[in-house]
């Protein structure tokens, strides 16, 4: 490649921003396409604001630690949880793009006030996944999904959101790490963007990311070993005996999923004997991640059925999650269904 060609390629890459990519994906400039592009831009803005605050967290008062409150999930609320949730609301309240926002941090959806422009979409999100990592400066993330409102929701129950994961229009996450990355899908592949701080723009880094068919990584909180059902314990015993496997678990779903997408393997958050439904929420954690991974050629399951087929019965419903490379997920499923198969594992 000549110097000129390399220069042009670099310029083309720097000009392929998130909003431009969304419009290219939709192959349209109609009102719906413009709205989705604007939605993604607002999500990106929220990500930039959260990334900026995280980068200064150790230097600012009132950023680290707990608020003293407990959220709808029964979890202690971090100060950054509150900030991140408020950022998403502020980014969308005056946008005219959404009619409501539903979050891990709110018992009921936030409805756009009548004195503000109201759109036709719903944003579901986990504003700060893995927030327990903030105080020790490890990776955290934001997870999001976009759905279109169906019906009027006059009773404010958001019952139209209780549909399977195939109804998501878009899904993605923002990873706050050494660089800030935004990974998204509109159902046309999975694409990776990196925030260029000098431009203030998310620039395309990987188009049509493909997860390896199998991988050596298994990501699970083994501290729960004796709380699991026997099939999950048997799977973990199996990988302990096999050469080539490597355990990686950070406590932040976004960070662990990003590793699995890039390197292959499997992430598990199974149910326990006490809580068979597990910990992860379906609508704004598990389903968006499943959508992304399947668009990258991976597989997502509850262990007994495809994750995207699950229909929630309430907004904050939980689900077990097994997600990653197709061969690795199938192996875990085989233990749950009591038909163990031999995996293909890359040596490390």
Curated annotation (Swiss-Prot):
GO biological process, one term: fructose 6-phosphate metabolic process
Superkingdom per UniProt: Bacteria
Organism field: Thermosynechococcus vestitus (strain NIES-2133 / IAM M-273 / BP-1)
MF terms (GO), sorted A to Z: fructose 1,6-bisphosphate 1-phosphatase activity; magnesium ion binding
Nucleotide-binding in keyword set: no
Predominant subcellular localization, coarse grouping: cytoplasm
Binding site for Mg(2+) 1: 104, 126, 128
Protein location: Cytoplasm
Co-factor(s): Mg(2+)
UniProt cofactor note: Binds 2 magnesium ions per subunit.
Name used for this protein in its record: Fructose-1,6-bisphosphatase class 1
One Pfam family hit: FBPase_C
Sequence similarity: Belongs to the FBPase class 1 family.
Pathway: Carbohydrate biosynthesis; Calvin cycle
UniProt subunit comment: Homotetramer.
First-level EC class: hydrolase
Residues bound to Mg(2+) 2: 126, 129, 285
């Amino acid at each position: 490649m000549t110097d000129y060609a390399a220069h042009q390629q670099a310029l083309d890459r720097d000009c392929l921003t998130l909003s431009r990519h969304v419009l290219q994906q939709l192959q349209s400039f109609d009102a719906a396409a413009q709205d989705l592009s604007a939605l993604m831009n607002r999500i990106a803005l929220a990500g930039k604001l959260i990334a900026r605050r995280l980068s200064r967290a150790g230097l600012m008062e009132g950023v680290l630690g707990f608020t003293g409150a407990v959220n709808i999930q029964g979890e202690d609320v971090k100060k950054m949880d509150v900030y991140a949730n408020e950022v998403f609301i502020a980014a969308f309240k005056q946008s005219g793009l959404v009619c409501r926002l539903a979050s891990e941090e709110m018992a009921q959806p936030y409805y756009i006030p009548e004195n503000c422009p109201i759109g036709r979409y719903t944003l579901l999100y986990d504003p700060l996944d893995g927030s327990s990592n903030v105080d020790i400066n490890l990776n955290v993330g934001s997870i999001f999904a976009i759905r279109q409102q169906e019906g009027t929701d006059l009773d404010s129950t958001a019952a139209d959101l209780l549909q399977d994961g195939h109804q998501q229009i878009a899904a993605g996450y923002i990873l706050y790490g050494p660089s800030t990355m935004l990974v998204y899908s509109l159902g046309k592949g999975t694409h990776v963007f990196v925030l260029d701080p000098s431009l203030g723009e998310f620039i395309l880094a990987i188009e049509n990311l493909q997860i390896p068919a199998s991988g050596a990584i298994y990501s699970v909180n083994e501290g729960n070993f004796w709380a699991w059902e026997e099939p999950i314990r048997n799977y973990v015993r199996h990988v302990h005996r096999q050469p080539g496997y490597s355990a990686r678990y950070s406590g932040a779903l976004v960070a662990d999923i990003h590793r699995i997408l890039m390197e292959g393997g499997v992430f598990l958050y199974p149910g326990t004997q006490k809580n068979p439904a597990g910990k992860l929420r379906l609508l704004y954690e598990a389903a968006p991640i499943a959508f992304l991974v399947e668009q990258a050629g991976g597989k997502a399951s509850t262990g007994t059925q495809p994750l995207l087929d699950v229909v929630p019965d309430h907004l904050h419903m939980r689900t077990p999650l097994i997600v990653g490379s197709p061969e690795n997920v199938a192996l875990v499923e085989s233990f749950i269904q009591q038909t163990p198969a031999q995996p293909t594992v890359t040596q490390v």
